[in-house]
Curated annotation (Swiss-Prot):
Active site as annotated: H11, E89
Lineage top rank: taxon: Bacteria
Function description: Catalyzes the interconversion of 2-phosphoglycerate and 3-phosphoglycerate.
Protein name: 2,3-bisphosphoglycerate-dependent phosphoglycerate mutase
InterPro entries from the UniProt entry: His_Pase_superF_clade-1 (IPR013078), His_PPase_superfam (IPR029033), PG/BPGM_mutase_AS (IPR001345), Phosphogly_mut1 (IPR005952)
Family in the record: Belongs to the phosphoglycerate mutase family. BPG-dependent PGAM subfamily.
UniProt enzyme class: isomerase
Catalytic activities: (2R)-2-phosphoglycerate = (2R)-3-phosphoglycerate
Pathway: Carbohydrate degradation; glycolysis; pyruvate from D-glyceraldehyde 3-phosphate: step 3/5
NCBIfam families, per database record: pgm_1 (TIGR01258), PRK01295.1 (NF002339)
Site-annotated residues for Transition state stabilizer: H159
């Protein structure tokens, strides 16, 4: 039986990350730094000897572009790639496109902090982290996890909050714990799973 390997990569820095804007389902591309981060992720995975069988990403360009750059660096652009909005970033609703300082002026520091850091309070017209998990987790369990458990080396390039859903179930974290978990841009996290989908080992390739 092949190893059950799952690699998660948060997209590289986007143009809106750089401008400190709420992004969500808006669709900015990577910055030059983001491109470099994605290529570095591919290089690190190449150094580890990874040969992927399948990859998953969202339908947002910053994640798709990150995946493309990682696979190019690996020389593995021919593998099957599945794209699904289930892996999209949390939808920030009315906050999307606003500078975080502008949002604080409009709604107040405390309210914006609640929207950003609470588990189940959504911003106007948007999703809470709980809502995002409800969208992302079924896709992970039904589509991604079976590939890993079959022994297919699996790569997921997505977003800070959609990847939190995967980390939450893999590491059996509470809502309070997952809220505190930060995923660095362009930093691969490698999970080796047991046959029952529990984590045998984890390796974070940040920096």
């Amino acid at each position: 039986m092949s190893e059950r390997l799952l690699v998660l990569v948060r997209h590289g820095q986007s143009e809106w990350n750089l401008k400190n804007l709420f992004t969500g389902w808006k669709d900015p591309d990577l910055t030059e730094l983001g491109v470099t981060e994605a290529k570095d992720a591919g290089r690190k995975l190449k150094e580890q000897g990874f040969a992927f069988d399948i990859a998953f990403t969202s339908v947002l360009i910053r994640a798709e572009h990150t995946l493309d750059l990682v696979l190019e660096e690996l020389g593995q652009t021919g593998i099957p790639v599945r794209k699904d909005l289930a892996l999209n970033e949390r939808d920030y609703g009315d906050l999307a496109g606003l500078n975080k300082d502008e949002a604080r002026k409009k709604w107040g520091e405390e309210q914006v902090l609640i929207w950003r850091r609470s588990y189940d309070v959504p911003p106007p017209g948007g999703e809470s982290l709980k809502d995002t998990l409800a969208r992302t987790l079924p896709y992970f369990v039904q589509e991604i996890l079976p590939c890993v458990l079959r022994g297919e080396c699996t790569l997921v390039a997505a977003h800070g909050n959609s990847l939190r859903a995967l980390v939450m179930v893999l590491e059996k974290l509470s809502p309070e714990q997952i809220l505190k978990r930060e995923l660095a841009t362009g930093a691969p996290v490698i999970y080796r799973l047991n046959a029952d989908a529990t984590v045998a080992s984890k390796l974070d390739l940040a920096a």
